[in-house]
Regions:
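Short, surface-exposed polybasic-aromatic patches that bind anionic ligands, especially phosphate groups
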Residues: 140
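Short nucleic-acid-contacting surface segments enriched for D/E, G, S/T with interspersed K/R
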Residues: 114-135
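Short helix-loop boundary/capping segments
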Residues: 97-105, 111
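Polar/charged alpha-helical tracts
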Residues: 25, 115-122, 175-179
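OB-fold ssDNA-binding interfaces and closely related basic DNA-contact patches used
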Residues: 1-98, 143-170
């Protein structure tokens, strides 16, 4: 799949190596089983090291900040640090069902992804549909006299795992998935 990045300076999402723009009208299906967390080490505005694990394996695989390998010296004023990261896997609801990974080390990005993780977990606990269909959006805010942007993962609908599976194999179309339609039961063949 492709990596999806968001710029807090421009408010633009960019997809893959060619920095393709993201269609604001494109729906994405979030896979809660793909939720990840970890650390990204930034030097000279580039990620030079990453540690990533499933949020469900945090107790066994999680790494504390004090246990991270040093890539110093760091220029903290230039943002050279190990930064916390959250992320999720998604599937574009397009003709090819492209797989995408969206991660963020910014506070606003982690807050947006973290909120979606919390909402999915809360819905799952009470047996409600817990797979969000989202649009990638953004909002502006002022910081130190500058206009900045934060990513917003805007849920259009929450769907069940069985409906999502039916959509992915073509048994439901996107409108039916958004509407919350249940997958059709396949008729069992009678043995002769």
């Amino acid at each position: 799949g492709d990596y999806l990045r968001f710029s807090g300076k421009t408010g633009v999402y960019k997809l893959g190596r060619n920095d393709e723009p993201v269609d604001p009208d494109q729906l994405y299906l979030v896979e809660p089983k793909s939720f990840i967390q970890g650390w990204t080490c930034w030097k000279a505005n580039k990620p030079i090291d990453r540690l990533v694990w499933s949020i469900y394996d945090d107790d066994e695989l999680g790494v504390a900040e004090e246990d991270l390998k040093s890539h110093g010296p760091y220029r903290e004023s230039a943002g050279e640090v190990w930064a916390e990261m959250l992320g999720t896997g998604l599937i574009a609801c397009d003709a090819v069902l492209s797989e995408v990974l969206f991660t963020s080390t910014s506070k606003s990005g982690r807050n947006s992804i973290g909120k979606m993780m919390e909402d999915a977990g809360a819905r799952s606990k009470v047996n409600e549909p817990h797979m969000p269909l989202i649009y990638f959006d953004s909002v502006t805010f002022e910081a130190q006299g500058n206009t900045n942007y934060k990513p917003v993962l805007r849920p259009e609908a929450w769907v069940t795992r069985s409906s999502a599976a039916a959509y992915l194999v073509g048994d439901l179309n996107l409108d039916q998935l958004v509407a919350g339609d249940k997958p059709k039961k396949r008729k069992a063949r009678k043995k002769k």
